[in-house]
Amino acid sequence: MAAKTPLLKAENVGIQFGGLKALSGVTMELHQGELIGLIGPNGAGKTTLFNLLTGVYVPTEGRIMLDGETLNGLPPYKITRKGISRTFQNIRLFGELSVLDNVKVAYHAHARHSMLSSIFRLPSHFRGEQEMEEKAIEFLNIFQLDSVKHEKAKNLPYGQQRRLEIARALAAQPKVLLLDEPAAGMNPQETKELMKLIAFIRERFALTILLIEHDMSLVMGICERIYVLDHGQLIAEGTPEQVRSNPKVIEAYLGEEVS
């Protein structure tokens, strides 16, 4: 039986900034519907890899493929349209816009009405705007943000801002969702709720998810496989149990707390 083609693949990917190799020889695969963790010490290259996968950086070696199509050199907005969306370690919402408008902005990448219809205020413009608003409200309901939809994003509590950023990333209708430390700054109860939310949206939207996170209870609790980076190179890959007991991982990152 032939092996399944990965949905997202990084093949011997690396990037060099001047004389510094930030990543080297990174190979990883994500298959449809998987929820995969990416862990490692600070400075290991995790966010750099996300920046490569989303077109913020261009690899100096190797290639990145989505559905078998090479993405190297494509600008971030084209990669978003092809099906990769992300959140950021530092929240990047439009603080002065409402919660609703933050989600609607993401839908414009897939807007069916043209710029001309918007300029001339044609009926198709109003139909398209109404459709986007209805979809945005649907997402806000899922993320329990519908009651604050008219609030400015900057006025939300931290946990709600995190949920809004995930809702906005989902509104871009991705095949692959990259979550960069979504539990950062959350208390244990918020983290527990986030775990349930991530599992729910994966099933609801048939998502493939790659997750960077330092909260090991979250990673070990919801991820099927985990990749481990250290000094820009992959040092391990496997199930949570395999990674937890890997001597290289324990030495580089986890320590005795999970051994």
Language model feature labels by segment:
Residues 2-259:
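Glycine-rich phosphate-binding loops of nucleotide-dependent enzymes
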